[in-house]
Curated annotation (Swiss-Prot):
HAMAP family: HslU. This is ATP-dependent protease ATPase subunit HslU. SMART domains: AAA, ClpB_D2-small. It comes from Desulfosudis oleivorans (strain DSM 6200 / JCM 39069 / Hxd3) (Desulfococcus oleovorans). CDD domains: RecA-like_HslU. Its main location: cytoplasm. ATPase subunit of a proteasome-like degradation complex; this subunit has chaperone activity. The binding of ATP and its subsequent hydrolysis by HslU are essential for unfolding of protein substrates subsequently hydrolyzed by HslV. HslU recognizes the N-terminal part of its protein substrates and unfolds these before they are guided to HslV for hydrolysis. Keywords: ATP-binding, Chaperone, Cytoplasm, Nucleotide-binding, Stress response. One of its GO terms (molecular function) is proteasome-activating activity. GO terms for biological process: protein unfolding; proteolysis involved in protein catabolic process. A double ring-shaped homohexamer of HslV is capped on each side by a ring-shaped HslU homohexamer. The assembly of the HslU/HslV complex is dependent on binding of ATP. GO terms for cellular component: HslUV protease complex.
Length: 456
């Protein structure tokens, strides 16, 4: 889906996120520009840098949801991480370069899975042959051509070549038909596990870009693990092993690094949490240090990973923050300049809450309806009941902390608490939820401001 037009991207986001048209347009253009850059001549391609985006808006308006949906929408390497996890170099915690390492590791894993799926058909055929070798050893004796011993319960050896081939084909037919599912076989599988070693755990081995598995691969003996399992499980295990052997990991790593460098996207959530809220010494100094550590990564630098050097020049960074205790201008000026596109997301009111409850795919009301249906309880919400829930969410947000659409989750739990508890005893019943039901269940919150503060 990497060649979606901006309009198509917005349509996809509209299925899950209500409103926020400006934010959707900005991320849609940024995604499309990734595709456009790949189409220009190579000499110009290196000069086109991504325009990083910062999404500004109160909590619960859809910033993080946009990131979640983008991750599913694009086939580009995508990582969402909270900026508050990072600490300045020299402090206990993770340094900012670890997000690039995480993105590379994630991409390698995804590519490895897709490559294994591509060779799965061949791996299944090879696994079948290995199972048949176990069930029907070769007439030369117990030694296989590759030197491994075929272990386990097996069929009596047939000396005649034609008879042996015929027996092998009969076994293959039975194997594919599932007639051998209750037979046990003994297997020898490569033991790919590594001994648990914890060295310098506070600094984190991944921070050094060291792959201890590769370092010890030539030193540790290649052990084999012997297991007795049923034929279907044996076939699955052998298929995984054969697929692993068929995948060229050097090629996968090269593809992953190139993909990260050319089309990687990092979503930095809660970037406002690394803004210094006051002048002076203390933890805020470390926060400013994190911002300064971010500068070279966002602008473009080389990060060492266990898979090699990775350039960040063309990685797209999308940051988001509520900025309710600070302003975007409180970021250090150098970092502000690295995010040229700023989008302010709108606060949500009762009309948006009403749409959130019913419009998106797998909307919140539909989730509760389906959950209760599993117990045999058929729930129906009247239109005025939904509007009352939306109005209540707006009212509680205005009277306490404004947490946006997240208020709907807590109100729905409070509204349906008794029904969710008693559902197993009400199988086969129908429940109609109207405005009076909503008003009655939520009247204590509306009438008691102190209580409403606890409805987070």
């Amino acid at each position: 889906m990497s060649d979606l037009t901006p309009a198509e991207i917005v349509i996809e986001l509209d299925k899950y996120i209500v409103g926020q048209a400006k934010a959707k347009r900005s991320v849609a253009i940024a995604l499309r520009n990734r595709w456009r850059r790949r189409q220009v001549p190579e000499a110009m391609r290196e000069e086109i840098a991504p325009k990083n985006i910062i999404l500004i808006g109160p909590t619960g308006v859809g910033k993080t949801e946009i990131a979640r949906r983008l991750a599913r929408l694009t086939d580009s390497p995508f990582l969402k991480i909270e900026a508050s996890k990072f600490t300045e170099v020299g402090y206990v915690g993770r340094d900012v370069e670890s997000m690039v390492r995480d993105l590379v590791e994630l991409t390698v894993t995804h590519l490895k899975v897709s490559e294994r799926e591509a060779v799965r058909e061949k791996a299944v055929r090879l696994a079948e042959e290995r199972i048949l070798d176990v069930l029907l050893p070769r007439p030369e004796g117990p030694q296989r051509a590759d030197g491994d011993e075929p272990l386990g319960s097996h069929i009596e050896i047939v000396s005649d070549d034609d008879g042996r081939v015929s027996t092998r084909e009969k076994l293959r037919t039975m194997l594919r038909a599932g007639k051998l599912k209750d037979r046990y076989v003994d297997l020898e599988l490569a033991d790919r596990s590594m001994p648990m070693v914890e060295i310098f755990s506070n600094s984190g081995l991944e921070e050094m870009g060291v792959n201890f598995k590769d370092m010890f691969a030539g030193l540790l003996p290649k052990n084999k693990k012997r297991r007795k399992v049923k034929v279907p499980e044996a076939l699955e295990m052998l298929t995984d092993e054969e697929a692993q052997n068929l995948v060229d990991m050097d090629r996968v790593v090269r593809m992953a690094v190139e993909k990260v460098e050319q089309s990687g996207i990092i979503f930095l959530d809660e970037i406002d949490k690394i803004v210094a809220t006051s002048k002076g010494s203390g933890p805020d100094v470390s926060r400013e240090g994190v911002q300064r550590d971010l500068l070279p990564i966002v602008e473009g630098s080389t990060v060492m990973t266990k898979h090699g050097a990775v350039k960040t020049d063309h990685i797209l960074f999308i940051a988001s923050g509520a900025f309710h205790m600070c302003k975007p201008s409180d970021l250090i000026p150098e970092l502000q300049g690295r995010f040229p596109i700023r989008v302010e997301l709108d606060a949500l009111g009762k009309e948006e809450f009403f749409r959130i409850l019913i419009e998106p795919e797998n909307a919140l009301l539909l989730q509760y309806i389906e959950l209760l249906r599993t117990e045999g309880v058929d729930v129906a919400f009247a239109d005025e009941a939904v509007r009352e829930i939306a109005a209540m969410a707006e009212e509680v947000n205005a009277g306490t902390e404004n947490i946006g659409a997240r208020r709907l989750h807590t109100l729905m739990e409070y509204l349906l608490e008794d029904l969710l508890f008693d559902a197993p005893d009400r199988a086969g019943t129908k429940v109609a939820i109207d405005r009076a039901y909503v008003t009655d269940r939520l009247k204590t919150i509306r009438g008691n401001e102190d209580l409403s503060r606890f409805i987070l």
